[in-house]
Curated annotation (Swiss-Prot):
Protein name: Transcriptional regulatory protein BtsR
The Response regulatory domain, residue ranges: 3-116
Function (record text): Member of the two-component regulatory system BtsS/BtsR, which is part of a nutrient-sensing regulatory network composed of BtsS/BtsR, the low-affinity pyruvate signaling system YpdA/YpdB and their respective target proteins, BtsT and YhjX. Responds to depletion of nutrients, specifically serine, and the concomitant presence of extracellular pyruvate. BtsR regulates expression of btsT by binding to its promoter region. Activation of the BtsS/BtsR signaling cascade also suppresses YpdA/YpdB-mediated yhjX induction.
GO MF terms, alphabetically ordered: phosphorelay response regulator activity; transcription cis-regulatory region binding
Source organism: Escherichia coli (strain K12)
GO cellular component, one term: cytosol
Region forming the signal peptide: none
Organism classification: Bacteria, Pseudomonadati, Pseudomonadota, Gammaproteobacteria, Enterobacterales
Pfam families named in the record: LytTR, Response_reg
KW Methyltransferase (keyword) present: no
Domain of life: Bacteria
Length: 239
């Protein structure tokens, strides 16, 4: 079975695509999302083989969402849009295919045929990475979704319950992005197995006798530094 996830902010567009895909005996629709933040979480949780992704969505576009996905678990991307002006950009973002709305069933059939053929010979994890840097981190908290600009991020931490972003004001939000994705797509520096830090907010490094250290940020918060990452941290600040 080919596991499919649909991410589109238009309910009617999702329904039309769903109805057609449900007629395919080898297609399983594992989920539907109405925005990119939900979509990122669904990709990480459901691990679809194929992502049908609308390009034009509020706050975070489909093109931006692709750059936020963990490259090791990125599905085949089929972009959906009503405007063909995005075609070249879509394929720069490593799209498998590109469909114009309203979707033509014959054209979609060709896409599915190519997907079936491709899945039989290629591991999706070998698809090239999108190296474009992230300008913000999508976060959720207190029944809202917000975009935290990189300059306002103090540090990011990974816990049993997920990945959390702390702002320079000390406010905390949950993100669906992984530490691996954030490390490769942002200026944040790894200082610990469970922490990334924004050196722009660093005020002091407090060295400890056991070879570890603690970072004191400008907002007074502290971030641990493990022995493994202390050398690279010093090099990053010119020591």
């Amino acid at each position: 079975m080919i596991k499919v996830l649909i991410v589109d902010d238009e309910p009617l567009a999702r329904e039309n695509l769903r109805v057609f895909l449900q007629e395919q005996s080898d297609i399983e629709i594992v989920g539907e999302c109405s925005n990119a933040v939900e979509g990122i979480g669904a990709v990480h949780k459901l691990r679809p083989d194929v992502l049908f992704l609308d390009i034009q969505m509020p706050r975070i576009s489909g093109l931006e969402m692709v750059g936020m996905l963990d490259p090791e678990h990125r599905p085949y991307i089929v972009f959906l849009t009503a405007f063909d002006e995005y075609a070249i950009k879509a394929f720069e973002e490593h799209a498998f295919d590109y469909l114009l709305k309203p979707i033509d069933e014959a054209r979609l059939e060709k896409t599915l045929a190519r997907l079936r053929q491709e899945r039989s010979k290629q591991d999706v994890s070998l698809l090239p990475e999108n190296q474009q840097a992230l300008k913000f981190i999508p976060c959720t908290g207190h029944s809202r979704i917000y975009l935290l600009q990189m300059k306002d991020v103090a540090f990011v931490s990974s816990r049993m319950s997920g990945v959390y972003v702390t702002s320079h004001e000390g406010k905390e939000g949950f993100t669906e992005l992984t530490l691996r994705t954030l490390e490769s797509r942002t200026p944040l520096l790894r200082c610990h197995r469970q922490y990334l830090v924004n050196l722009a907010h660093l005020q002091e490094i407090r060295l400890e006798d056991n070879g570890q250290a603690e970072l004191i940020l400008r907002n007074g918060l502290t971030v641990p530094v493990s022995r493994r990452y202390l050398k690279s941290l010093k090099e990053a600040i010119g020591l």
